[in-house]
């Protein structure tokens, strides 16, 4: 931007030629005996028009003239708005970002100075409970699409100066703000430096989803499993920060990205901290059991029925033989049809309006399953096994992990269909080998089981009482490993 209002106005009109909502006004303003030419620039859809009228009121302009447009601190102290000095050499990208963030640009001709006044009124959504992470005893406020609001939800829970916040602008066109939060005296500095470097290296024209950031920072390693967790609950995000993890908040996304994570972390839920520890442990074990059932039950059943019927008890075998009488498809094809059918119902339930989604998944499955049995297309035993497998996936909150279970279910089922129990065992080995090679910001995905960290195995598997949670997870290599000090520790 040049040093005269006329040149600035012409440049700005070229920059925003196709933006009819950007208003550029050249006005002469008189206060006392002084007259100056003022250039006002703003975007009408992201500002508060009431504040706009107040910002250019005679009283404020009089203060500007009295300060000779040189003392921005005096200007800010006399104004009820947030006033900062505008560098006239700012690039198109910087000026665009300021305008579309809701700032009013004021440029004075005689004094060759400019200011920005924050009069933003951006479209926002009120804070409400997360739809995917329901709670009974926990807090009912959830993240929204506004970055500053989300940071405030975390700040009000962590009232400490050790909570560091780094901000990055990513996307040449979207100029999206990405916030990195961590406890500087707890989190591993090596991990923080790694994620900071990866965020700075991102060079993309636009960011519209936090999933884009996740893919950039996790690298190019092939993984069927998600290497990052997400949550819509601030209380759970704070709990992760206290454990030594970091959080990414993306402007426009109502979820927080959490890393580093390992496999046991995905069976934890935000509600675990509000349960009695025995029930919380039971829920975690149930989730682990649900994961195993979801992946392996259909494959194991089809291998048993197709290749090893001699291992089935005679009473059950007789029942299965009667139920399969008249079925036109072999067991593997029958199972594949039912798995695909249930997946279609589940995906349809996720995409139609919430009021009908639950009904479609449950009632639709019952009606279609019963109709398939009555018509003789599938056997009742196969419907039961596939239904149990699909329902078991709902023990998890993370939809990315749920999608992984669906893919693995297909893989295990196909190998078991072709090779029987041998294929079933080989599929288990392949999954274990794949998982053992995964890393989330240096953290092994099977930690603390492989490599073994015995002090963290029990807390990762069970929800132990808070009185026993004296140390942070050792596998995270935190700077401060102590969570709870006893009276004896304080006296030392």
Curated annotation (Swiss-Prot):
Any Pfam family: GerA
Biological processes, Gene Ontology terms: spore germination
GO CC annotation, single: plasma membrane
Primary location recorded for the protein, binned into one broad class: membrane
Subcellular localization: Cell membrane
Keyword list, A-Z: Cell membrane, Germination, Membrane, Plasmid, Transmembrane, Transmembrane helix, Virulence
Topological category with respect to the lipid bilayer: Multi-pass membrane protein
Chain ranges passing through the membrane: 246-266, 285-305, 325-345, 353-373, 377-397, 413-433, 442-462
Function: May allow B.anthracis to germinate within phagocytic cells and therefore involved in virulence.
Annotated family: Belongs to the GerABKA family.
Name listed for the protein in its UniProt record: Spore germination protein XA
Lineage: Bacteria, Bacillati, Bacillota, Bacilli, Bacillales
